[in-house]
């Protein structure tokens, strides 16, 4: 019969095996020996459940099913980093540092792991709690799921009570295996390892998290000063002595030239790593100098993240397809041999227009270089002409629309070819998708696949038909059950009460965006007033130029538009502006009157569009760039160059919470 001493001995042995294998990558035993000792441990725990502690290696395999994720407050905020995109940005950062603390400085440079920021709390050396970064102040409790990561020790080498920060991630090989399994099971594939890691750590079933083979690198303590060290580099060394996994590829740099060399080295070597990185993090090494530099609302002034330029990858151009947009513009799209770019698999990319294809001499069958603009949108950069075999085919735009066969035209001062047939089915379908979108009529449950079904089965021919759909007809569609149909019909009904600007934007009048639609709705109050307005009246309104005014007059001169509006009226769709009018609001309510506000980074409680609409409703103007005329910058998480410029110009910087304090208390935002 086993005694407790043997049980505790097994825990220590298995912990050491895990440290050797997962942390320092130096396995000291065969898998069979590890498994044999784990089975011995499990048998003892089955016989003596009262001995089991949260630090037991058996807890790493998962099994606990969680009810949800509690909120966790970070005692020390988990700040995000400002971004640098070139040497000029880094030189500006370096200048600000030197202006404040002098020239006796060094930077600790570390790989920027592309994963999920987390915090680990240890109490008397034992793992107590793990949490996500969240908004930097409040995160989610993912203690059980982080426990399944084998490289996170359940006990430190010393009995410290500390909060450690790091990046949880999914290695490339684990990501590939996971997607292979999901493909075999007919499940949706993860776009990239970062999304897979984040999704794994938010699983309520910890067994799923345990099966995902996640890893972690630790890079900071909430307050390194508490550990008796004077530099960040010494702090990282101490983390290693505690048994925590720290990335080995860090380097202490004594000049910007050394920083540039480190960046250049890892720009070239990043593809060979077993995990994704998306940049390099610079940290002022001296902790006292860090304290002198201080922090902004969202980021430390003593650290910055250099983001790698967009990755360029070669692949084969298999074909060029033509897509018809809602305004009739014909856009050529490259069909590519699937290739991995910046963390996702790319098989299609925009070619923009015929002139660009001709200018770049892009041919079907070419080997082409592609990248993601802003690491998001795939685009073809150029053909690699030296790889041509002679079988490649030059591309020529057709003379007729691929959807309705109408003759294509090129309007004055436009490079794009356009189908001007108002009954073109492709334009109508794209227009319907736009009409139901969030910024327009915001009809939930009416995605592209449902619209395509409705259109192909002749249940709708224009946007007005949406409001006359019956439950019986909707139930006949694929993947539309009783609950889905009920929710969809309720959403359609609710959309009838939208204020006029939502309808105006949804109608897709050429050149009229969401902001102009709001200005028109406020000025004219009703659709009837707007549709008889002349060009002179329209151009007298802020945000409405001559080109837009011409487009509006032309739109409402169309008899088919009059018929459409009558159908929408018959369906009960509101055609009046129901929002607040500036002239009816007091000075106290117009808290942003005459103010220019810039939004940057990710907001947690508000969408970017909601924040913009609320600021504008209170008299403010939302701009896309920071200048001396900017009054306030609202910075969410991962704010970049706009935040840095605001700091440079000494413009007031608000957090999202600061913004919410100035907004009317709608929807519990101020709770």
From Swiss-Prot:
Q: Give cofactor(s), names only.
A: Mg(2+); Mn(2+)
Where would one find the signal peptide in this protein?
A: none
User: What keywords does the record list, in alphabetical order?
Assistant: DNA damage, DNA repair, DNA replication, Ligase, Magnesium, Manganese, Metal-binding, NAD, Zinc
An example Gene Ontology CC term for this record? cytosol
Q: Output the InterPro entries linked to this UniProt entry.
A: BRCT_dom (IPR001357), BRCT_dom_sf (IPR036420), DisA/LigA_HHH (IPR041663), DNA_ligase (IPR001679), DNA_ligase_CS (IPR033136), DNAligase_adenylation (IPR013839), DNAligase_N (IPR013840), Hlx-hairpin-Hlx_DNA-bd_motif (IPR003583)
Function, please?
A: DNA ligase that catalyzes the formation of phosphodiester linkages between 5'-phosphoryl and 3'-hydroxyl groups in double-stranded DNA using NAD as a coenzyme and as the energy source for the reaction. It is essential for DNA replication and repair of damaged DNA.
Identify this protein by name. DNA ligase
Look up and give the organism this protein is from. Answer: Listeria monocytogenes serotype 4b (strain CLIP80459)
**Lineage, highest ranks first:** Bacteria, Bacillati, Bacillota, Bacilli, Bacillales
């Amino acid at each position: 019969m086993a005694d407790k001493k043997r049980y505790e001995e097994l825990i220590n042995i298995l912990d050491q095996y895990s440290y050797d294998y997962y942390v320092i990558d130096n396995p000291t035993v065969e898998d069979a020996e590890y498994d044999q000792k784990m089975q011995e441990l499990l048998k003892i725990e089955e016989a003596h459940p009262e001995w089991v502690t949260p630090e037991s290696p058996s807890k790493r395999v998962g099994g606990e099913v969680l009810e949800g994720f509690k909120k966790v407050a970070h005692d020390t905020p988990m700040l995000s980093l400002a971004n640098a995109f070139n040497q000029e940005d880094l030189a500006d950062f370096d200048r600000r540092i030197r202006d404040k603390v002098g020239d006796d400085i060094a930077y600790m440079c570390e790989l920027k792991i592309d994963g999920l920021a987390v915090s680990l709390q240890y109490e008397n050396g034992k793992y107590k709690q793990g949490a996500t970064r969240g908004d930097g102040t409040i995160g989610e409790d993912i203690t059980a799921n982080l426990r399944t990561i084998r490289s996170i020790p359940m006990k430190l080498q010393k009995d410290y009570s500390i909060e450690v920060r790091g990046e949880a991630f999914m290695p490339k090989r684990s990501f590939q295996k996971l997607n292979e399994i999901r493909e075999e099971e007919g499940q949706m594939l993860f776009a990239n390892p970062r999304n897979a890691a984040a999704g794994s750590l938010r699983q309520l079933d910890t067994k799923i998290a345990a099966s995902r083979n996640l890893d972690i690198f630790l890079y900071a303590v909430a307050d390194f000063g508490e550990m008796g060290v004077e530099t960040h580099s010494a702090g990282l060394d101490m983390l290693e002595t505690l048994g925590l996994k720290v990335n080995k590829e860090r380097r202490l740099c004594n000049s910007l030239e050394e920083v540039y060399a480190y960046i250049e080295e890892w720009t070239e070597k990043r593809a060979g790593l077993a995990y994704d990185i998306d940049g390099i993090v610079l940290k002022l090494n001296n902790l006292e100098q860090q304290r002198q530099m201080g922090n902004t609302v969202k980021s430390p002034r003593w650290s910055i993240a250099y983001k790698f330029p967009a990755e360029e990858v070669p692949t084969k151009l298999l074909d060029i397809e033509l897509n018809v947009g809602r305004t009739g513009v014909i856009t050529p799209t490259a069909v590519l041999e699937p290739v991995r770019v910046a963390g996702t698999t790319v098989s299609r990319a925009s070619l923009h227009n015929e002139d660009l294809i001709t200018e770049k001499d892009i041919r079907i069958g070419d080997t082409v270089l592609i990248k993601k603009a802003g690491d998001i949108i795939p685009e073809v950069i150029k053909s690699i002409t030296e790889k041509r075999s002679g079988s490649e085919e030059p591309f020529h735009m057709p003379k007729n629309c691929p959807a309705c066969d109408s003759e294509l035209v090129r309007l004055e001062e436009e490079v794009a070819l356009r189908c001007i047939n108002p009954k073109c089915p492709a334009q109508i379908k794209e227009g319907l998708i736009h009409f139901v979108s969030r910024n327009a009529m915001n009809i939930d449950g009416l995605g592209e696949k449902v619209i395509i079904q409705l259109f192909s089965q002749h249940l709708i021919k224009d946007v007005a038909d949406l409001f006359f759909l019956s439950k019986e007809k909707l139930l006949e569609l694929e993947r539309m059950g009783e609950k889905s149909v009920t929710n969809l019909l309720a959403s359609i009904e609710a959309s009838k009460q939208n204020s006029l600007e939502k309808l105006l934007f949804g109608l897709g009048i050429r050149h009229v965006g969401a902001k102009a639609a709001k200005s028109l709705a406020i000025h004219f109050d009703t659709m009837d007033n707007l549709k008889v307005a002349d060009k002179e009246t329209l151009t007298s309104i802020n945000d409405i130029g001559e080109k837009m005014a011409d487009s509006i007059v032309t739109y409402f001169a169309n008899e088919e538009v009059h018929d459409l509006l009558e159908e929408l009226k018959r369906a009960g769709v509101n055609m009046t502006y129901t929002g607040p009018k500036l002239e009816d609001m007091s000075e106290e309510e117009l808290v942003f009157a005459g103010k220019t506000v810039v939004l940057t980074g990710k907001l947690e409680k508000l969408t970017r569009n909601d924040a913009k609409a609320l600021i504008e409703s209170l008299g403010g103007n939302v701009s896309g760039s920071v200048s001396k005329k900017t009054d306030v910058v609202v910075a969410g998480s991962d704010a970049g160059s706009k935040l840095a410029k605001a700091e440079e110009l000494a413009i007031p910087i608000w957090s999202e919470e600061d913004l919410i304090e100035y907004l009317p208390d709608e929807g519990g935002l101020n709770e």
